[in-house]
């Protein structure tokens, strides 16, 4: 898999008039492997358990709320006619899209207004991230074939894979491109492993669903701005699938016994579940057992 790093390519500001992105918490579903849950287990098996099995609530952070809003605005931007996909249109979508998110999710409704109005540079930060997007791509030139798409597949090994894909673009001459937006800080070259893991994960899922791998993987860091572009290799993706098999086997083994051990480290300082962690003299709730579909 080859990689290209590109900081703010020289797209001019789009001219023209102003005009008009995890599986939800509905009915319980059997656990499946996703990039975020895989990262949780590798970071701390107990964290995985509390999120994926106990499903303990966590209040969204301001950064997460901003990310949710920016993803939703970019998704809505692509519903506009191509000529209207300009920076002013994206900024104009913030208020109505934010209102829709609040109406659909009480947790967001409790946090989003404060993030936009009282947090330091709240609304300005959302606008800055949206403006940065236009430094990386010109959406007037793109016509996605899928946006904010839930993808699910079961490998031949029985490992269930699940997640949301931000965008899939059809490419001239055949093939397709997988695009993911990030609103957090861009990693340095030595710390791209987690982001690359996620892109490989979704590329493998699409390979299994479509029978062919993406021709391109684009990871767009709006807080940079920085574009990372990868060219996937199908055989490498299939080897990566065997890595996921091993990871899922470890999760299922822990699930059978309830032995999800804590793994103390620097990230403990910001962990919501530290009060329940034995490594910090906390007591986790009784293990409810591995969830099975009803």
Where does each model-flagged region fall?
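Short, polar/flexible loop-turn hinges at active-site or ligand-entry regions and domain interfaces
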Residues: 54-63, 80-84, 188-189, 258-259
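A non-catalytic, helix-rich entry segment at domain boundaries
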Residues: 73-147, 154
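Solvent-exposed, amphipathic alpha-helical segments
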Residues: 69-80, 250-254
């Amino acid at each position: 898999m080859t990689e290209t790093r590109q900081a703010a390519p020289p797209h001019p500001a789009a001219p023209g008039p102003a005009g008009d992105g995890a599986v939800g918490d509905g009915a319980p579903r059997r656990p499946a492997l996703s990039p975020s849950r895989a990262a949780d287990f590798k970071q701390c098996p107990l964290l995985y358990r509390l999120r994926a099995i106990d499903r303990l609530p966590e209040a969204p952070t301001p950064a997460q709320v901003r990310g949710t809003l920016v993803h939703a605005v970019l998704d809505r931007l692509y519903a506009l006619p191509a000529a209207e996909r300009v920076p002013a249109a994206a900024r104009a979508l913030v208020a109505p899209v934010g209102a829709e998110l609040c109406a659909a999710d009480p947790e967001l409704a409790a946090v989003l207004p404060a993030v936009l109005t009282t947090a330091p540079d709240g609304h300005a930060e959302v606008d800055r991230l949206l403006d940065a997007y236009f430094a990386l791509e010109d959406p007037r030139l793109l016509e996605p074939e899928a946006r904010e798409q839930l993808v699910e597949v079961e490998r031949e090994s029985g490992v269930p894979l699940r997640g949301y894909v931000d965008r899939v673009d059809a490419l001239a001459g055949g093939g397709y491109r997988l695009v993911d937006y990030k609103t957090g800080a861009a990693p340095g070259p030595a710390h791209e492993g987690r982001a690359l893991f996620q892109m490989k994960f979704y590329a493998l899922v699409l390979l299994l669903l479509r029978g062919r791998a993406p021709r391109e993987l684009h990871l767009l860091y709006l807080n940079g701005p920085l574009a990372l572009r990868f060219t996937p290799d199908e055989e490498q993706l299939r080897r990566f699938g065997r890595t996921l098999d091993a990871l899922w086997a470890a999760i299922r083994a822990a699930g059978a016994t309830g032995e999800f051990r804590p793994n103390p480290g620097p990230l403990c300082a910001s962990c919501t579940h530290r009060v329940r962690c034995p490594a910090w003299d906390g007591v986790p709730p009784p293990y409810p057992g591995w969830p099975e579909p009803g």
